[in-house]
Amino acid sequence: MKLSLSPPPYADAPVVVLISGLGGSGSYWLPQLAVLEQEYQVVCYDQRGTGNNPDTLAEDYSITQMAAELHQALVAAGIERYAVVGHALGALVGMQLALDYPASVTVLISVNGWLRINAHTRRCFQVRERLLYSGGAQAWVEAQPLFLYPADWMAARAPRLEAEDALALAHFQGKNNLLRRLNALKRADFSHHADRIRCPVQIICASDDLLVPSACSSELHAALPDSQKMVMRYGGHACNVTDPETFNALLLNGLASLLHHREAAL
């Protein structure tokens, strides 16, 4: 699996791995790259079955497999210890990495994540699946911003959204791969073993997230033994895109604090 690695800003700089959500594209993190690369070696990637890592995914594709293939790719690149920043599905992959490879994951940042899929989130995906079946990729892509962004943010950026739609259609991961990744997301359940995650965790959520209620992050916070929760009042599901200034400050402060906390505990 292909990874994109930034040059380390100094010798032995900590590594931060960015894991996007269901869309799978590493470019999702573009608003964070410049600030992160000043202090960390940053790893981005298109998830298997998407973008520049094309593949046909098995019907039983799982979050565990997503975590394993990423860890193997990191080890092959010479990276054995790393912090993880995961958004939604990416946060699930991050938790799986922390469970399966505890010696490797130094810190986890969960952005609009959850323990197990909430009934409201499931309802949103049911609607989106019906759109996919009835209207194909175009209907899926055109509806997606409604679940990602606040209405006023979208209304002020209509040309940008049209350009994003065209790009998403041109690089659509395919119906079968999308549904198999979505099914992996829906099956994931960390409610019975989140307390085994021992690395420090920062939880970031947006109170106006339409897709994943912020209560899901409260449940995560209660379940994770070494966690802190930060709530953004605005930004929607893709709060790192819509309000990068606020998000980046939380992210940078969280990484610095938790990595120091981890080092002090060793």
From Swiss-Prot:
Catalytic reaction annotation: carbamate + 2 H(+) = NH4(+) + CO2
Q: Name one Pfam family in it.
A: Abhydrolase_1
Gene Ontology MF terms in the entry: hydrolase activity, acting on carbon-nitrogen (but not peptide) bonds, in linear amides
- Keywords attached to this entry: Hydrolase
Q: Which GO terms describe its biological process?
A: nitrogen utilization; uracil catabolic process
Does the keyword field hold DNA-binding?
no
InterPro entries referenced in this protein's UniProt entry, alphabetically:
AB_hydrolase_1, AB_hydrolase_fold, AB_hydrolase_sf, Pyrimidine_utilisation_RutD
Question: What's the EC number here?
Answer: 3.5.1.-
Output the SUPFAM superfamilies linked to this UniProt entry. Answer: alpha/beta-Hydrolases
NCBIfam families linked to this entry: RutD (TIGR03611)
What functional role does this protein have?
A: Involved in pyrimidine catabolism. May facilitate the hydrolysis of carbamate, a reaction that can also occur spontaneously.
Protein name (Swiss-Prot/TrEMBL): Putative carbamate hydrolase RutD
Its source organism is Escherichia coli O139:H28 (strain E24377A / ETEC)
Taxonomy of origin reads:
Bacteria, Pseudomonadati, Pseudomonadota, Gammaproteobacteria, Enterobacterales
